[in-house]
Structures are given as C-alpha cells and as structure tokens.
UniProtKB/Swiss-Prot annotation:
Skin. Highly expressed at sites of hyperkeratosis. Also detected in thymus, tonsils, testis, pancreas, liver, placenta and brain. Expressed at stratum granulosum and stratum corneum at palmar and plantar sites (at protein level). This is Serine protease inhibitor Kazal-type 9. Keywords: Disulfide bond, Protease inhibitor, Secreted, Serine protease inhibitor, Signal. Serine protease inhibitor which specifically inhibits KLK5. May contribute to the regulation of the desquamation process in skin by inhibiting KLK5. GO terms for molecular function: serine-type endopeptidase inhibitor activity. Disulfide bonds join C32-C68, C46-C65, C54-C86. Dimer. Interacts with KLK5 and KLK8. Residues 1-19 form the signal peptide. It is found in: Secreted. GO terms for cellular component: extracellular region.
Length: 86
C-alpha cells in the first residue's frame, strides 16, 4: 500500500513538471504564420487587449496582432525579443 502511494505521488509529480514545462514552451515565441501581408494602403484591425511584446526595434507592441502586423510590414526583419515591455 505504501509503495503504491509513493509510486502514485511520483507519477503525479512528474506529470505536473512536464505539463509546466510544456506550458512554458508554448509561450516563448510569437507565431505570426497565420497573419498575411496586407496590400499597400490596407490596414489590419487588431483587438486592444494588452499583452505586451518587445520587438527587436526596441518598441513595445500591445499584443501579437500589432506585433505580427509590423513583422509582415517589415518582411520579417522585426524579430521577437520577449513577452512584456521593452
């Protein structure tokens, strides 16, 4: 009984550690692949939920929509630095 409890506790601990690592990995980059480059003069309408992203140009973007729009506009020269303010 005691050995079963220890094995179960160990399995639960490992599962928790792996799920935390997976959650960290999913939010280490911004995926701009689903944003298309717009024709000249056309604007993208982005939601205004604040989830800041720091770009390689030293600017803080409100969220992934604003950041990815700029990435597409610059043909990929703008790079992701980190989540949060610059």
């Amino acid at each position: 009984m005691r050995a079963t409890a220890i094995v179960l506790l160990l399995a639960l601990t490992l599962a928790t550690m792996f799920s935390i690592e997976c959650a960290k990995q999913t939010k280490q980059m911004v995926d701009c692949s689903h944003y298309k480059k717009l024709p000249p003069g056309q604007q993208r309408f982005c939601h205004h939920m604040y989830d800041p992203i720091c770009g390689s140009d030293g600017k803080t973007y409100k969220n992934d929509c604003f950041f990815c729009s700029k990435v597409k506009k610059t043909d990929g020269t703008l790079k992701f630095v980190h989540f949060g303010k610059c």
